[in-house]
Regions:
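Aromatic-rich peripheral "rim/lid" segments of glycoside hydrolase catalytic domains that contact
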Residues: 4-7, 27-130
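Surface-exposed cleft-lining segments at the edges of enzyme active sites
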Residues: 17-26, 60
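Active-site cradle of extracellular carbohydrate-active enzymes
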Residues: 1-10, 16
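Short, conserved beta-strand edge motifs with alternating hydrophobic and charged residues
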Residues: 14-18, 47-50
Length: 130
């Protein structure tokens, strides 16, 4: 669709990808990276605009999986620097998420304590900065 729009002269310079995913079902990070690359080859800028990773019954093991999913999604963006120019979570704390506290989708819990996902995102960014 975007390729066709560009071919018809539609003035489009970028696309936002919503990433509302779950620890029980998330996209392959290599497929996400490939999609970002493909969009870049069309001359489009990409932004991941709404990242959250639902985690119902989020015990320690599931929080670690949630952290891994966040890290892989962010890495897919960072691996396409110059194309993927933004990575945003769809909120800050599980207390105020549009999905409800019970699915704990964000980087901070309902008490604003940092979750493993926060530290994974930080580590991924720090590794890129090295």
């Amino acid at each position: 669709m975007l390729k066709d729009m560009k071919a018809r002269g539609v003035p489009i310079s970028g696309v936002g990808l919503q990433m509302h995913v779950s620890v029980d079902g998330y996209p392959n990070p290599w497929a996400v990276a490939a999609n970002i690359k493909r969009l870049g080859e069309l001359g489009l800028e990409v932004q991941i605009t709404e990242a959250d990773v639902r985690c119902a019954n989020c015990d320690a093991a599931r929080q670690d999986l949630q952290a891994s999913v966040y890290g892989h999604l962010l890495q897919a963006c960072l691996n396409n620097s110059g194309v993927c120019v933004n990575f945003e979570t769809w909120g800050i704390s599980d207390r105020h998420t549009w999905l409800g506290e019970d699915v704990a989708p964000l980087l901070f819990d309902a008490s604003y304590a940092k979750k493993p996902a926060f530290f994974e995102v930080l580590a991924t960014l720090n590794a890129k900065a090295q």
